[in-house]
């Protein structure tokens, strides 16, 4: 949505990939005009994970492909991380109490959605 307004800089980031996050904050601070960074930072209480698993949960989300690391600048999207293979989505989901109700069929549907999203990203951004 932010990119649709053609702002000078937008990005997605994760607390699990801190070097990437820092680089994006630096780039955003150097842009003339508005910038936006959407950061995934798990909430232990809301997600139903132990506090000491926060970074690991954020890493699993990126590694299983449910969150991507990208930037938008000069009117184009740029993928910062394009994994050849994804880790198991069910491992990411099942470690959180908020997803305890999901069936195997539900998770398969999520995987199908992830695969469709990544096919579009790779087709249009790379």
Functional labels for PLM-detected ranges:
Residues 10-13, 36-40:
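Short, conserved beta-strand edge motifs with alternating hydrophobic and charged residues
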Residues 1-31:
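Conserved thiamine diphosphate
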Residues 43-126:
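Flexible, low-complexity linker and terminal segments
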Residues 28-36, 57-60:
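Short, structured secondary-structure boundary patches
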């Amino acid at each position: 949505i932010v990119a649709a307004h053609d702002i000078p800089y937008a990005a997605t980031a994760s607390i699990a990939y801190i070097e990437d996050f820092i680089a994006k904050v630096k780039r955003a601070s150097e842009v003339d005009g508005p910038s936006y960074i959407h950061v995934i930072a798990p909430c232990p209480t809301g997600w139903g994970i132990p506090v000491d698993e926060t970074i690991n949960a954020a890493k699993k989300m990126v590694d299983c492909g449910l969150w991507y690391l990208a930037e938008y600048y000069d009117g184009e999207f740029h993928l910062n991380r394009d994994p050849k293979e994804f880790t198991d989505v069910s491992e990411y989901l099942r470690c959180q109490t908020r997803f305890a109700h999901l069936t195997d069929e539900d998770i398969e549907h999520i995987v199908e959605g992830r695969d469709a999203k990544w096919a579009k990203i790779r087709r249009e951004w790379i």
